[in-house]
Amino acid sequence: MTGTTLAATYGPISGADLEAELAQPRIADGDAQDAAVYERDGGAHAPPFASGGAPPDGDRADVRRAAGAGDASVRLTRVSKRYGERAVLADVDLSIGRGSFVSIVGRSGCGKSTLLRLVAELETPSAGTLVKRGDGGGALDTRIMYQEARLLPWKTVLQNVMLGLGRRAKDDARAVLDEVGLLARANDWPAQLSGGQRQRVALARALVHRPQLLLLDEPLGALDALTRIEMHALIERLWREHRFTALLVTHDVQEAVALADRVLLIEAGRIAFDQRVPLDRPRARASAAFAALEDRVLQRVLTGSDAAPAAPNAAGPEGASRGRAAPASGLRWAV
């Protein structure tokens, strides 16, 4: 099977998200054939991502303590989003600290992905202000990763990682493939990879740009449990090494607690719950503290009220522990 055959049988590319992510870089790179496909589908008119410098240096513990404080990379003030008469988000106030890892959970249709699309500038707020500030006050370079890897099947793994970049980026692309453990598959086609491997390629494609903000829209939802845990470890390791800000949307409460410094719950278009995660990394999922915190978040999602006891030593907007924590529920999907 050749790349030409794959290109001929793939058909038109659909999905404004993919187009917005890749169209502008591909046009700038001069790949006229691929750019024509994106342009035909309207992708060239989607808002381009801002370019920026490298993520800030500094002590990660200090960065985490500052999450949501003065040094914010993303700030939303009274942001609302409507589609016609339907209000999806209403008066959202949110500050995301530079270098922090924030997870967003909530029931289906609550506005999680809409909030992510606003931060990605794939949508514009109906009201309110959104400010994204990069290192030194410049533009905040932003990349996004979806549940579907969205790889171009007529391009090799290496070529997919290099999308939007010139040929001089080949060494950088190979280096980031090595970081995600797929350098040996650089010349393979996407169809030859497993689902988890395709997501690793998608992650590499985002990280090769050295973003300051990485948005994750349920990127692991279609993977099996063991592959998800492996991907959790990979994402956490790369986050700690590259020091970008991460915003994750997920239905999986355990995933949210395992990865984030802070878990937000969206209900009826508003941030209804803001829970800090004061657990050491890497997270010990079998520990009582992890189980109690997971259960607290899950019960809050399911009941719609902050009635569950706090995790031991949990410090956050909800206050300190209020007694012995209940056992963790076997259910961890907030649907």
From Swiss-Prot:
SMART domains: AAA. GO terms for molecular function: ATP binding; ATP hydrolysis activity. Pfam families: ABC_tran. Keywords: ATP-binding, Cell inner membrane, Cell membrane, Membrane, Nucleotide-binding, Translocase, Transport. ATP binds at G106, R107, S108, G109, C110, G111, K112, S113. Transmembrane segments: none annotated. It is found in: Cell inner membrane. Residues 74-293 form the ABC transporter domain. GO terms for cellular component: plasma membrane. It is an enzyme of class 7 (translocase). It catalyses: ATP + H2O + aliphatic sulfonate-[sulfonate-binding protein]Side 1 = ADP + phosphate + aliphatic sulfonateSide 2 + [sulfonate-binding protein]Side 1. It is a peripheral membrane protein. The keyword Translocase applies. Its main location: membrane. Its EC number is 7.6.2.14. Residues 29-61, 308-335 are annotated as: Disordered. It comes from the Bacteria. Belongs to the ABC transporter superfamily. Aliphatic sulfonates importer (TC 3.A.1.17.2) family. The complex is composed of two ATP-binding proteins (SsuB), two transmembrane proteins (SsuC) and a solute-binding protein (SsuA). Part of the ABC transporter complex SsuABC involved in aliphatic sulfonates import. Responsible for energy coupling to the transport system. This is Aliphatic sulfonates import ATP-binding protein SsuB. The gene is ssuB.
